[in-house]
């Protein structure tokens, strides 16, 4: 009988997981699972995410904290205890956090140590939404809830019957301050902690109000309570406030913060919370997500596909986060990490362009251009105040990763039609960054070699040299595209088109692969195409050879033509997932993720490889793109805590899924084109900000019918392997006829291939 009951339970559950959703949801925010990717650790990333509670691009995010203070893995799904509910600005565990503080309700003995206050919890009593978080803290018999605004939040703490109910405020170490004001039921303070870059006069000020007077309280510093001191400043400060509560009594906290001042934090609180109840704030946050997520409607897929889709779209809208605030005069202002002062205008932080130039920013330009206009204005302020465009902003320049990919982010926005900001200053900033070495991964390391030789040599003690050269060449292409679009003299932008061909100097004619090259012109010897790092960045030659976004046709010629090009693409999936990790001295997590994926040398868990699948469109075999796109979505994305196949990286890995599920991808930002794949859903609608709609239909789509038999664009037969951004922006209907067998006639003519600089007729 027990076996029968078990089967009865399993079968409906399995049916539910594969249930088809035929209608686009009215509440897509309810399909979001913020816990996707949280089952991660330094040695293996399944996303390296945390369950961010925020509004789209909010200045602050919130998360339950399971990791110790200072641990970049601030929430992991396999943890047993929660140490606090934390305000965070952390874009990645590898970047760590800045300006954080936490709040933790407790009962019983007055205490503050993070280990002593921690409580067991269960995922069965945890609710995680983009706009709301709730958890039952078993050791304290307290339920903690939180809902956010852009710069504020409300917490609702439900206590048991206790004479000793408390909450702990932890302002973290490396410089903090706290002040208890009992007469106003108020605690204020600041945190100065940060992890990356150089920050001037940095503080995150916070203010907390309770609706219940606290009758007992104490500040604390480092490891001890501080008697008779309502205000304390030091390395690691905090407070504990308490009161008696009845069973089920709810204590409400109203919280806000500012990077500018306590007065601005108070203003943020009054402006964003006003007199709203917890539930009113929750409903506003829910509506904010609903508005953004419903810009893209999908239907005709399984419930798991819907969950993965909207969870990915949510991740794309968390970062970069706003660093600007609105002052008492209604003016937009921001704390500048460069001057340490309050400056006018927009500013954003929490993104690395090495990751996000590929798909995240192109998707913003298509669906959410107005927020990217603000971001472009923010980049202008970065340049004016700091002297450089950031490549990794957290919240200032961060000395990590390679490339000069701000060029792509700026150029793609303008080429895709974004206007209303000072593009001339941004163009000036790109030229400056393209020709100079800057601090903390800005500008171009090795630029003098690059300008003289056309590449960064392998033997001049500049690491990741081949990868740098390939990325600089693409970035030069982006600058040329922008200069041309701005009507600059050809003598100016023409030079950058020439530099964009420097990729040719990195392709070894013997192996047909990218390879480090010495100062004297000889290629690196010995050479192992499976060796990670060294001449490349978090990858090997099989991954980086294809980073010629601007001229895939030119790359194919160097490989001996399109047939050889396709054969080399095939090898990526046919070769075993072998590797040489000697450069690192151990197996870094990106290597392990490639091995675990079991797709040969294809390393989707890291960004340099994510466009590779789409390159079959350039060699007349688009059906292989269609096959591998669906395989990747099926195998490497799930709506579960281990749902990603590597670092999610601030929306980029999610953006690949969103684009691919819609049927196209941005292989070459800074052009007008997207490269075709095949849609995942039977129906999709993209509601553009200009009021137009892109409708994507694939009535006979299924897991078996993953190949494109034919395509109609606005009712007319369409054979090209690419779509025009400018045409899509007019509104469009794409009708795919899907089949279980590849159509090896469609998209095979050279005239149907996507853009390559070598074949550009303009």
Language model features: what each stretch is:
Residues 20-361, 365-408, 414-470, 478-505, ...:
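Accessory carbohydrate-recognition regions in carbohydrate-active enzymes
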Residues 698:
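Conserved catalytic core of nucleotide polymerization and phosphodiester-bond processing enzymes
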Residues 475:
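ATP-dependent phospho-/nucleotidyl transfer catalytic cores
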Residues 1-22:
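Bacterial Sec-dependent N-terminal signal peptides
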